[in-house]
Amino acid sequence: MKKVYQGKTKDVFELDNGNYLLKFKDDVTGKDGVFDPGENSVGLSIDGIGRANLETSVKFFEILNNAGIKTHYVSANLEEATMEVLPAKVFGNGLEVICRYRAVGSFLRRYGSCVEEGAKLDCYVEATLKDNDRCDPLITSEGLEALNIMTQAQFDSMKSMTQKISNIVRDTIAEKGLELYDIKFEFGFYNDEVILIDEIASGNMRVYKDGVIVDPMDLTALLLDK
């Protein structure tokens, strides 16, 4: 088993069968020791968050697969905090796609002169390039096409999937009395189709209860009835 990529919250290994293995770590993105899924660097470590993120991911991947939505998920080993996935090809050097229901985080930092904190957004989708040196810059569908990263048809498919998946996650957590403010995904290309890759983890979403943000570990416990 060969390590092919070292990420902020996961390491990636190539398996003999051609698939990949994701090893979840106890690191989360944030700043000054405060959790923030919108940051592009590791801000703190939380004991057990790697397994927690994996458990949450497995729950949602199985929901999506049952709904007929294509993902890279194959299987998981909770004890080892690993997940086997299909070898999907990333777009460019990687894209992150954010779906927003409320104005918080980097959206508020960018557009705070035009919108109040917590204002409702209608399943707003935006994409960023994975580029730590440039702080994960925003990019439009036209920009992605001009740079030969993604076609307009692929972008449209990705956007539609993002909204569909986000609504499934939103409705699922609403059953626990929780509200999804925003969530981050990654997509890849496999068998000529755009599919969801990476994870659907507590550390990749902002969830609130009674107007207060829910800690990722607490969120996992609520979602998994622990």
State the predicted function of each range.
Residues 37-52, 134-161:
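Short histidine-centered catalytic/ligand-binding loop motif
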Residues 19, 92-94, 177-180, 191:
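Coil-to-beta-strand transition motifs
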Residues 109, 114, 200-226:
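C-terminal helix-cap and adjacent tail motif
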